[in-house]
Amino acid sequence: MERTFAIIKPDAVERGLSGKIITKIEEAGFAIVGMKKIHLSRAQAEGFYYVHKERPFFNDLCSFMSRSPVIVMCLQKENAIADWRTLMGATNPANAEPGTIRKEFAKNIEENSSHGSDAPETAAFEIPYFFNSFELVG
């Protein structure tokens, strides 16, 4: 079994879409082995997105991610990383396939409702950034 990291971003939480997104996750066969609602500080957002520090969108991204609560999750299933990225859809919701989370729930490329690890190495950083081993069940 593989684990991946997922975030329901502020834009989706603010609009009350968390339950619908969680339902899609479970219907796709993922086990949610860790989940909590948190409000990231600016420093936490900067630490999490440090790989984008030199990118022009870094400040806006960190402001967005720390503006209101998010739901962080550790998801588990065979091929979890690729399957979660497929379920999320393209980063730009205009390019996302019908039925994907971003096509259904994202507002735009910046407020695209969800985040997911893009590789095993990324998941290995992202999961323990938010969860200790006692918080993961399954």
Swiss-Prot record:
<feature type="binding site">
    <location>
        <position position="112"/>
    </location>
    <ligand>
        <name>ATP</name>
    </ligand>
</feature>
<comment type="similarity">
    <text>Belongs to the NDK family.</text>
</comment>
<dbReference type="GO" id="GO:0006183">
    <property type="term" value="P:GTP biosynthetic process"/>
</dbReference>
<keyword id="KW-0460">Magnesium</keyword>
<dbReference type="GO" id="GO:0006241">
    <property type="term" value="P:CTP biosynthetic process"/>
</dbReference>
<keyword id="KW-0418">Kinase</keyword>
<feature type="active site" description="Pros-phosphohistidine intermediate">
    <location>
        <position position="115"/>
    </location>
</feature>
<dbReference type="InterPro" id="IPR036850">
    <property type="entry name" value="NDK-like_dom_sf"/>
</dbReference>
<dbReference type="GO" id="GO:0046872">
    <property type="term" value="F:metal ion binding"/>
</dbReference>
<keyword id="KW-0067">ATP-binding</keyword>
<feature type="binding site">
    <location>
        <position position="85"/>
    </location>
    <ligand>
        <name>ATP</name>
    </ligand>
</feature>
<feature type="binding site">
    <location>
        <position position="91"/>
    </location>
    <ligand>
        <name>ATP</name>
    </ligand>
</feature>
<keyword id="KW-0963">Cytoplasm</keyword>
<comment type="function">
    <text>Major role in the synthesis of nucleoside triphosphates other than ATP. The ATP gamma phosphate is transferred to the NDP beta phosphate via a ping-pong mechanism, using a phosphorylated active-site intermediate.</text>
</comment>
<protein>
    <recommendedName>
        <fullName>Nucleoside diphosphate kinase</fullName>
        <ecNumber>2.7.4.6</ecNumber>
    </recommendedName>
</protein>
<keyword id="KW-0546">Nucleotide metabolism</keyword>
<feature type="binding site">
    <location>
        <position position="57"/>
    </location>
    <ligand>
        <name>ATP</name>
    </ligand>
</feature>
<dbReference type="GO" id="GO:0005524">
    <property type="term" value="F:ATP binding"/>
</dbReference>
<keyword id="KW-0808">Transferase</keyword>
<dbReference type="Pfam" id="PF00334">
    <property type="entry name" value="NDK"/>
</dbReference>
<dbReference type="GO" id="GO:0005737">
    <property type="term" value="C:cytoplasm"/>
</dbReference>
<keyword id="KW-0547">Nucleotide-binding</keyword>
<feature type="binding site">
    <location>
        <position position="102"/>
    </location>
    <ligand>
        <name>ATP</name>
    </ligand>
</feature>
<keyword id="KW-0597">Phosphoprotein</keyword>
<dbReference type="GO" id="GO:0006228">
    <property type="term" value="P:UTP biosynthetic process"/>
</dbReference>
<dbReference type="InterPro" id="IPR023005">
    <property type="entry name" value="Nucleoside_diP_kinase_AS"/>
</dbReference>
<comment type="subunit">
    <text>Homotetramer.</text>
</comment>
<dbReference type="InterPro" id="IPR034907">
    <property type="entry name" value="NDK-like_dom"/>
</dbReference>
<dbReference type="InterPro" id="IPR001564">
    <property type="entry name" value="Nucleoside_diP_kinase"/>
</dbReference>
<dbReference type="GO" id="GO:0004550">
    <property type="term" value="F:nucleoside diphosphate kinase activity"/>
</dbReference>
<feature type="binding site">
    <location>
        <position position="9"/>
    </location>
    <ligand>
        <name>ATP</name>
    </ligand>
</feature>
<keyword id="KW-0479">Metal-binding</keyword>
